[in-house]
A protein has these predicted regions:
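Structural preference for solvent-exposed beta-strand-turn elements
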Residues: 1-352
Length: 352
């Protein structure tokens, strides 16, 4: 590429064209804060695998928010800490998290998903990659994310704002789990999509006895998968499109864990985690209501038990104090009675 008379010369094979300044920008072109520098001899000391980072981006970008009124959730969070570079994305219904080995300091930045489009493909062709963070702007907490390859340097200034505390949204306790082939599961879900005749189609999943059973809610179809299963027999309903997307991103063998029919579910594969909210059904609503009432009764019973324990402790303390008082009285020797002196009583004096 060569600048000539304020135009950009673009050569592709035998074709050559010229673009004037701002000619490629339209009314709907979104603004960007990305700086791109191209150099055929960019010296790069790699600190992360280019292909590994490209795969990580492809696994988190699909789960950023599409709505313009949620700009923070339209970003991918990059956070380097404790020898890991963690990429996080969320859209309010799903949360994707993946951690890569990274031992080159600490930092974090929020980068818009629009600025990251095409970066994964560029990284697949790069031989070396380096990720770093640097201070930017006037604020003390302003940060920029820098990605260097042997040809190009990308620099994104972090968007201002606080990302949700995603760690609290990842479930840690489960009552049922299954380990199965994600590719076979995608085929099973696609076979159930045909009788649904709709883009939005729910899928009921139940696993136990070494099988994962997928079915349409109206019993129009059912598919079974061999799997390693454990725990209780719980049925959960997921959006079919969300389920297929989750399985494709996980790829290979996937672990699927659930707590109950209304709590967040967890897909995991080789360090990658995807949290997906289930669809609410009448059964799930009833179970949630029953669980809330049970927890309320348990909390009430624990409060009563605690109050009784406190009362019992007070009673025991009072009895112990009385016993100690009696023992102290017994230790005192009786003193002989002495005659008491009579006190003089003064007559009242009249005041004029």
């Amino acid at each position: 590429m060569r600048a000539t008379d304020k135009k950009l010369k673009v050569a592709c094979g035998a074709n050559t064209g010229y673009l004037a300044d701002s000619q490629w920008i339209g009314d709907k072109t979104p603004p960007t804060l990305c700086d791109v520098r191209v150099s055929p001899n960019n010296s790069v000391k790699p600190n992360i695998g280019a292909g590994e980072l490209a795969e990580a981006l492809n696994r988190v970008l699909p789960f950023t928010a599409k709505e313009d009124n949620r700009p923070i959730l339209q970003c991918v969070k990059f956070a380097a800490k404790d020898g890991k570079l963690t990429l996080v994305s969320a859209d309010g219904f799903r949360l994707a998290v993946i951690a890569l080995d990274y031992d080159d300091g600490e930092g974090q930045a929020l980068v818009s998903r629009d600025d990251l489009k095409g970066i994964a493909n560029a990284l697949k062709r790069a031989k070396r990659a380096r990720v770093s963070f640097e201070r930017s702007g006037d604020s003390l907490d302003g940060m920029s994310l820098i990605l260097d390859t042997e040809l190009i340097r990308y620099k994104w200034r972090s968007m201002d704002g606080s990302y949700p505390a995603y760690e609290e949204l990842i479930p840690t306790e489960f009552n049922a789990f299954a380990h199965f082939d994600a590719i076979e599961a995608v085929k099973a879900v696609n076979s159930l999509k045909v009788p649904a005749f709709s883009k939005a189609y729910p899928i009921d999943l139940t696993f136990g006895n070494g099988k994962v059973v997928m079915a349409n809610p109206d019993d129009k179809g059912q598919a079974e998968l061999n799997a390693d299963t454990g725990g209780e027999a719980i049925k959960v309903r997921l959006d079919g499109g969300y389920l297929v997307q989750a399985l494709k991103v996980c790829g290979g063998m996937v672990d699927f864990k659930i707590t109950n029919s209304y709590s967040p579910t967890l897909f995991s594969s080789n360090g990658y985690q995807l949290v997906a909210m289930p669809m609410m059904t009448s059964e799930a609503s009833e179970q949630a209501k029953a669980d809330r009432e049970a927890k309320a009764k348990q909390a009430e019973a624990e409060a009563v038990t605690q109050a009784e324990a406190v009362a019992q402790a007070h009673t025991e303390a009072a009895v112990l104090a009385d016993e100690q008082g009696d023992e102290a009285t017994e230790d005192i020797e009786p003193v002989a009675d002495k005659p008491r002196r009579k006190r003089k009583v003064r007559e009242p004096v009249a005041v004029a």
